[in-house]
């Protein structure tokens, strides 16, 4: 008997495929049955080798050894997933396996994960590709019935390979170069550093902003409505107008214009717009939203989340009304639901995957069992579908121009004619939406008629600086980066991809370059002193959002077969070579790069400073360190962050709430810090009541 080997990206997805295919016999690392073997990767099983694999001299960091630009790339099996790779290699090379199906995630990274395992295992068998946008059983069956030769995805693989190797070369060379120049570890990334630079630039704009006061005279009409004068920079001028207006009994209508306007429904979600709304409405980080969406996808409740499209293909038009009606019934919005399918259909704007949708499985699911975060994301996606196919929001706007005391005043009024899609949005998301103050209706007046003035007052305001970046605004900036410098006919891709932007933000936070400040719904992202210092010493080509956006656009062209991979890689290598040969240390920069002192070493009394991987004693022979990736805290379900480190160094103890036991139970405890005889840190637990 011969088998087809199916390789998924993770165990849970492999189990879902196995169930549909009838491979019900569970083995060590795979499922078997009905002519199928179904196994899985666990993320990236195969990774790019570190520099020292190419040459032992690279163990030591030296500018003289740069640039490091491999001619023949080498890969290693990840140590943590070596067993699973061994299982896959054995399955791939079994004599009774006659073909392999790549069933990893249908995107750039999923393609790379499979191809690297396939090549590292030395497999030569025919490969077909499974391409899914939904994990529903009928979608899985349809996908396996329409497998394509993997060669159709060679361009996608080439783009993934170029992205991985470019990131490696920029990260390895730039990090070593600047670390050596400034005598301390500095992490530099192709995408990470330009994003950090954007936040530093925004904070510089805010710091340089000088607010200017302005003054406005406001008239209240007896028949309803208010009118505003122009802005005055001098208070005395506004006060003079106010005095004159108070002497007048009325204002003369110079112009009255009434227009009917409409606001079209919003487009369906792609991942980035979902992440932006989830941050704005729910306070979720981009990574939290991606995690919740991925879980919903694997539970078959939404379609593939890592999409950059906001439209659907023509073949989906027939089933969409039923999906919308079913979704409306679940979320209490079925009343007066009108489905305009063509508003969301545009196959020409669909790339690898169509826009995010809830699936038909939502109607059969026990939604009460969903975690709160997942339910909130599902509600956003459902609401967006119903709004996107709904009626326009229609209103009548009246604009009055009046004259009082020789000065022009403007008033706007608004009357809603049809709530349209906004009524659905309020039904499904009403508790999340901020209540905006709508313009009141204005009296029905004619030109040259007189409006009695009920009152007049002076209002003071001031110009506002740019807003601090939160995740919503930063994601938007990443998405549109470089657009102004590109030709009009070039498709904008921005910095990163929908699948990687969240990870970029998290990496900047974890490495201490950005910090989140504020409460959950109003958290902003601020560059730390360390982040500002890094950007200060980085040359333009490393921190330029425009250059990074241009690279992303070229990766997209490679993916579409419009550009040769070698051309892109040559450009990256030339940039790195130029960087290494022309960059010198910035004078006075070392003062900016000082390590932050957070406390006193309990072992020797020297300063403890923060570095990338932990808090280290500055005294050379002392071995005291608090690792950020600390195993003791991991076992408690906690992370050793700067607040905890500060408490431990100051008080020798820190109280933690909701620690997790091995059995999943939660408890409160106090962590005590002491030192081993050789100076290394040692932790113990103290429980309430001395237990």
Residue ranges of model-derived segments:
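Short glycine-centered, acidic/aromatic-flanked micro-motifs in structured strand/loop junctions
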Residues: 104, 276, 306
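Basic, low-complexity terminal or inter-domain segments flanking catalytic cores
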Residues: 2-5, 81, 92, 120, ...
């Amino acid at each position: 008997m011969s088998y087809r080997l199916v390789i998924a990206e993770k165990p849970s997805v492999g189990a879902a495929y196995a169930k549909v295919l009838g491979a019900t016999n569970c083995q060590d690392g795979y499922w078997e049955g009905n002519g199928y073997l179904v196994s899985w990767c666990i993320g990236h099983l195969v990774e790019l080798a570190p520099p020292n694999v190419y040459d032992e001299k690279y163990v030591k960091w030296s500018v003289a050894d740069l640039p490091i630009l491999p001619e023949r790339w080498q890969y290693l099996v990840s140590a943590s997933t070596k067993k699973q790779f061994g299982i896959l290699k054995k399955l791939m090379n079994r004599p009774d396996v006659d073909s392999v199906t790549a069933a990893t995630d249908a995107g750039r990274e999923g393609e790379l994960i499979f191809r690297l395992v396939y090549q590292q295992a030395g497999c030569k068998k025919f490969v077909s590709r499974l391409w899914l946008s939904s994990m529903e059983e009928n979608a899985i069956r349809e996908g396996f019935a329409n497998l394509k030769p993997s060669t159709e995805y060679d361009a996608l693989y080439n783009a993934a390979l170029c992205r991985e190797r470019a990131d490696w070369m920029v990260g390895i060379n730039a990090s070593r170069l600047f670390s050596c120049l400034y005598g301390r570890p500095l992490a530099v990334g192709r995408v990470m550093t330009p994003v950090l630079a954007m936040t530093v630039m925004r904070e510089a704009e805010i710091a340089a902003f000088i607010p200017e006061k302005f003054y406005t005279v406001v008239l209240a009409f007896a028949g309803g409505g208010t009118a505003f004068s122009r802005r005055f920079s001098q208070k005395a001028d506004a006060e003079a107008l106010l005095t004159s207006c108070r002497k007048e009994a009325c204002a003369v209508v110079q112009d009255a214009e009434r227009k009917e306007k409409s606001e079209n429904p919003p487009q369906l979600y792609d991942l980035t717009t979902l992440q932006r709304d989830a941050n704005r409405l729910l306070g979720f980080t981009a990574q939290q939203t991606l995690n919740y969406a991925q879980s919903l996808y694997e539970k078959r409740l939404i379609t593939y989340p890592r999409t950059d499209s906001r439209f659907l293909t023509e073949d989906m038009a027939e089933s969409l009304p039923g999906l919308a009606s079913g979704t409306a019934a679940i979320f209490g919005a079925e009343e007066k639901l009108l489905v305009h399918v063509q508003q969301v259909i545009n196959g020409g704007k669909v790339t690898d995957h169509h826009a995010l949708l809830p699936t038909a499985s939502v109607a059969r699911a026990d939604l009460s069992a969903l975690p709160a975060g997942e339910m909130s994301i599902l509600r956003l996606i459902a609401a967006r579908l119903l709004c996107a196919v709904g009626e326009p929001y229609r209103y009548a706007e009246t604009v009055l121009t009046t004259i009082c005391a020789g000065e022009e005043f403007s008033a706007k009024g608004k009357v809603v004619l049809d709530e349209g899609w906004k009524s659905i949005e309020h039904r499904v998301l009403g508790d999340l939406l901020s209540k905006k103050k709508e313009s009141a209706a204005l009296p029905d007046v004619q030109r040259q008629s007189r409006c009695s003035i009920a009152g007049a007052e002076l209002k003071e305001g001031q110009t506002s600086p740019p807003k601090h970046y939160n995740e919503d605004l930063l994601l938007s900036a990443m998405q549109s980066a470089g657009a102004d410098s590109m030709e009009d006919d070039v498709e904008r891709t921005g910095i990163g991809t929908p699948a990687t932007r969240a990870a970029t933000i998290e990496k900047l936070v974890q490495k201490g370059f950005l910090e989140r400040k504020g409460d959950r719904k109003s958290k902003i992202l601020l560059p730390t002193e360390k982040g500002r210092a890094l950007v200060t010493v980085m040359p333009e080509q490393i921190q330029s959002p425009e250059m990074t956006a241009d690279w992303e656009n070229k990766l997209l062209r490679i993916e579409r077969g419009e550009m040769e991979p070698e051309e892109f890689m040559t450009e990256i290598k030339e940039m790195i070579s130029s960087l290494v040969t022309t960059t010198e240390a910035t004078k006075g920069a070392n003062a900016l790069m000082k390590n932050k002192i957070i406390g006193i070493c309990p072992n020797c009394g020297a300063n403890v400073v923060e570095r990338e991987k932990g808090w280290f004693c500055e005294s050379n022979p002392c071995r005291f360190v608090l690792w950020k990736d600390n195993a003791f805290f991991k076992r408690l379900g906690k992370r050793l962050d700067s607040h905890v480190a500060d408490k431990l160094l100051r008080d020798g103890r820190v109280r933690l709430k909701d620690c997790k036991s091995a059995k999943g139970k939660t408890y409160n405890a106090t962590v005590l810090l002491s030192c081993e005889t050789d100076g290394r840190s040692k932790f113990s637990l103290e429980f309430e009541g001395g237990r």
